[in-house]
Amino acid sequence: MSRILLVGESWFHYSVEVKGFDSYTHGGYEVGTEWLAAAFSQGGHDFTHLPSHLVATEWPVDLTAFDLVLLSDVGENTFLLTPETFVRGERRTNPLVAIADYVRTGGAFGMIGGYLSFGGIDGRAHYANSAIASTLPVLISPFDDRVELPEGTDPTIDIPGHPALGGATSLGPLLGYNRLAARTDAEVVARCGDDPLLTVWNVGGGRAFAYASDCGPHWAAPSYLASSDYAALWNGIVTWATGERGSN
C-alpha cells in the first residue's frame, strides 16, 4: 500500500441562463478525482485529495507523510499567490520548492495533464520556469501547449512491459494532451503520435513522471476511464514511482 496525495482536480463554476426575457444565475463545485480514486482503491492505496482552493489554507503539508505526490489541473499561481503573499505582502514558504526538495531526497512525484498543468491553456499553468520544472522528466512550453483531438487518438507504447504500465496494453482513446518534450536522460514509455504521453526518470534520490493527458474527461474518453487498462496503468505508475516490489 502507498500513501498518495493529489493536489488539484477541483473547480467552482458560475453560470448565467437566459430563457427569453428572463435570466438567472447558478453556481456549484465539482471534483474530478473519481476515476483515480477508484483505481487507487482497487490497488489498495491510501488516497488523499487536497482541492485547489484549499492549498492556501492547508499548506504547509508534511510531504513525508506521503509516498507519492501528484499535481493535476492546478496552476503555479495557486501555490505562489496565497493571501499572505498576494494580499498582505508577507513572506512564506514556497510549496513548489518543498515538493522539489521532497522528490530529490527520495520522494515520488508526478504531474498529470490538463488545462492548468504543464504550460496549460494560454500558458496559464506557468510551470515552465517553476521550482518543480527541473524535477520533471520533460521540458515544458511557456506557451499554450494543448493538443485538442476531437477525433481521438490511440497512444502507442514504446516500452512494452515497463513496470509503470502495470500490465496495461491500451492507453486510450484520448481526446487531447499537453505537448511536452522528453529530457535526454528520461524514458518515454508511451506516446501520442510523436509526443511523449508517459515519461519517467530518476531524479536525485527519488522518482518523477509526467503524464501528458488528463486523468478524467474530456481528454480521457469514457470508454477508457471504464476500462481495466486505466486502473492497471495508474497502479503501475504508483508501483514504479514508489519503488514497490523492486520495480525498475
Task: Show which residues each predicted segment covers.
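Short, surface-exposed, polar/charged, turn-prone segments marking secondary-structure boundaries
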Residues: G32-W35, G75-T78, P137-S141, P160-P163, ...
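Amphipathic alpha-helical segments in well-structured domains
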Residues: T33, R92, L96, A125-I132, ...
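An acidic, glycine-rich "communication" segment
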Residues: M1-S2, F12-K19, T33, R104, ...
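Generic alpha-helical propensity signal that fires on short helical segments
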Residues: D22-T25, E84-V87, S117, Y127, ...
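Solvent-exposed amphipathic alpha-helical surface segments
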Residues: G43, F143, W240-E244
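A glycine-centered loop/beta-turn motif at secondary-structure junctions
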Residues: M1-G20, S52, A56, A65-V69, ...
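Charged/polar, solvent-exposed surface patches and flexible loops
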Residues: A38, Q42, D101, S134, ...
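Helical hinge/lid and interdomain linker segments adjacent to catalytic or ligand-binding clefts
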Residues: L5, F21-D122
